[in-house]
Amino acid sequence: MIHREKYHHLRIRLASPEQIRSWAERVLPNGEIVGQVTKPYTLHYKTHKPEKDGLFCERIFGPIKSGICACGKYQIIEKYSKFCEQCGVEFVESRVRRYRMGYIKLACPVTHVWYLKRLPSYIANLLAKPLKELESLVYCDLFLARPISKKPILLKLRGLFKYEDQSWREIFPRYFSSRGFEAFQNKEIATGGDAIKKQLSNLDLQGVLDYAYIEWKELVEQKSTGNEWEDRKIQRRKDLLVRRIKLAKQFLQTNIKPEWMVLSLLPVLPPELRPMIELGEGELITSDLNELYRRVIYRNNTLIDFLARSGSTPGGLVVCQIRLVQEAVDGLIDNGIRGQPMKDSHNRPYKSFSDVIEGKEGRFRENLLGKRVDYSGRSVIVVGPFLSLHQCGLPREMAIELFQAFVIRGLIGRHLAPNLRAAKSMIQNKEPIIWKILQEIMQGHPVLLNRAPTLHRLGIQAFQPILIKGRAIRLHPLVCGGFNADFDGDQMAVHIPLSLEAQAEARLLMFSHTNLLSPATGDPVSVPSQDMLLGLYILTIKNHQGIYGNKNHPYKQNNNKIFLNKTPYFSSYDDVIKAYNQKKVRLHSALWLWWGSKLRTITSINREKPIEVQYNSSGISFKIYEHYQLKKNKNEKNFSVYICTTVGRIIFNQQIEEAIQGTLKASLFRNQSLPAITI
């Protein structure tokens, strides 16, 4: 079992054969060592009990029922013994079958298909050989002829040669006899995973690193040849050298040996992670992993028999069986990676180990990263433009369920409910006092919103919850960038931070208005897009006619009366909004707005000529420009300025000013101490 106090992180790396053996092997009180799975059996067809030394063996993985051994004895009866001497099963809890592992001792080394076939191929990069050549070697289509010792021997072949070549059979017919071929193969040639393992074990990683760096440096200093094909060839060689340098450096830094990419011991998962379930009338359903494990054990045992009877087994048959073992292990680890997957009797591909752990429904994302936790909920998100940037709308039904413990404490603390049962009854009846207490609690308690997949830290942010009607979570449209969310049916999870540390972290680090910039690039994240940009464009669109809008229509008719159509004057934002609500002006109608005594915009006022100039008897002048008016006294000083604008632009400018003032107030509020909420 993994305890949180003992383990703080998880590291995934290559395991040595000794480490794999240490995971599975255990010494029983009688001195017997168990852990190796040698039989391809699962459950007995009559008793439905695990077979000894099989894939569900109770001696290896632990008892099916806590305190009961395979022969039916109880721990209470055998209270002075920790295991049953008759069947060898320990008296422990059955949950050990969730983490106790076994192993299969392979009769020949098997190349791990992840490091061979996955791109980039680590084995091909480390050995600096083509992937097709290595594949032919792994699956016994080619043989590696290379002397192990440096002593002179009769036959020394260099490189690779094809097994199907008939000239080989004609030249060396005696070596293809049973014993001659075996002796020749053990000394001079290798194929399958054994050939890969020998090459990897003979690698000097520091030498590979040094020579690759020297060659890469020479290629970098080399000038272009002018031939496009040669330049591409040199670039591919440089890319290969860079990959070799990185790979060799990582192996040296982590103290991992390259030959560990070839398996000699195959781990067997705990039986609870690959269960076999009994249905009605004795019918059994099993995990696909069990069938794949059985195929590996069957073929491995056959190879063991061939090697044990080497005197009567043809060498070609042994080579074919080595290939079958390699393909069986490939199907267990990653079925279908080489093309045609292994299928069952219903022509359905088996679900391999890679299929179990990868993807959205894999072990990591489904069971480890996607656990269900208390004080959390999930619902569809919809747009909430009326919210502030740091707010989110929680449905009443969800909020009362999430904050139920806090509401109960508030009811009992205020003596509104005598006990827990009465408080729950009030919540179920949805009495009005419940919502008042809930609002008070939510004012001082942030919530965390998370949208899967959480690819960076902006995938989970804190918000101030607001009670709303309906069943969907309301979200401000500007925070969708960090979540990569849109309102086409996306769902988000709500979490309640319980501890004071979690609440402090949510307030200081995770609030949405404190995460406006991308932590990776520094670019703004909360930027308007899509319908927001379209709405802002329509709101602030300019009336192209401007002050000339009444030139073609100087009069207007209302209630059979004709009035002079003049551009209206307003002294404040409120007057404009009031006139717009009373439908006296339109959204894009041009109007004059009083702008104080100073022109707060950068303009070419000294070069622009007025359209019209008016003087009165007291010496006050009116200069009318295309976008503004200046009212000056005798000394030519401005004491009144009007600007030409529209209702939409005034609404937009008013919202911007209120947002800036709200930010200033919020910053002043953060510097003050927060009042305590008594419940």
From Swiss-Prot:
Principal localisation: plastid
SUPFAM superfamilies xref list: beta and beta-prime subunits of DNA dependent RNA-polymerase (SSF64484)
Annotated protein name in UniProt: DNA-directed RNA polymerase subunit beta'
Entry binding sites for Zn(2+): 69, 71, 84, 87
Oligomer status and interactors: In plastids the minimal PEP RNA polymerase catalytic core is composed of four subunits: alpha, beta, beta', and beta''. When a (nuclear-encoded) sigma factor is associated with the core the holoenzyme is formed, which can initiate transcription.
Entry GO terms, CC: chloroplast; DNA-directed RNA polymerase complex; mitochondrion
Gene transcribed to yield this protein: rpoC1
GO BP annotations, alphabetical order: DNA-templated transcription
SMART domains in UniProt: RPOLA_N (SM00663)
Listed cofactors: Mg(2+); Zn(2+)
Name of the top EC class for this enzyme: transferase
Keyword Membrane listed: no
Localization terms from the record: Plastid, Chloroplast
Reaction(s) catalysed by this chain's protein: RNA(n) + a ribonucleoside 5'-triphosphate = RNA(n+1) + diphosphate
Function per UniProt: DNA-dependent RNA polymerase catalyzes the transcription of DNA into RNA using the four ribonucleoside triphosphates as substrates.
Binding site residues for Mg(2+): 486, 488, 490
Pfam families reported in the protein's UniProt record: RNA_pol_Rpb1_1 (PF04997), RNA_pol_Rpb1_2 (PF00623), RNA_pol_Rpb1_3 (PF04983)
Family: Belongs to the RNA polymerase beta' chain family. RpoC1 subfamily.
Protein's UniProt keywords contain Magnesium: yes
Cystine pairs: none
GO MF annotations, alphabetized: DNA binding; DNA-directed RNA polymerase activity; magnesium ion binding; zinc ion binding
Co-factor binding comment: Binds 1 Mg(2+) ion per subunit. Binds 1 Zn(2+) ion per subunit.
Protein keywords: Chloroplast, DNA-directed RNA polymerase, Magnesium, Metal-binding, Nucleotidyltransferase, Plastid, Transcription, Transferase, Zinc
EC number: 2.7.7.6
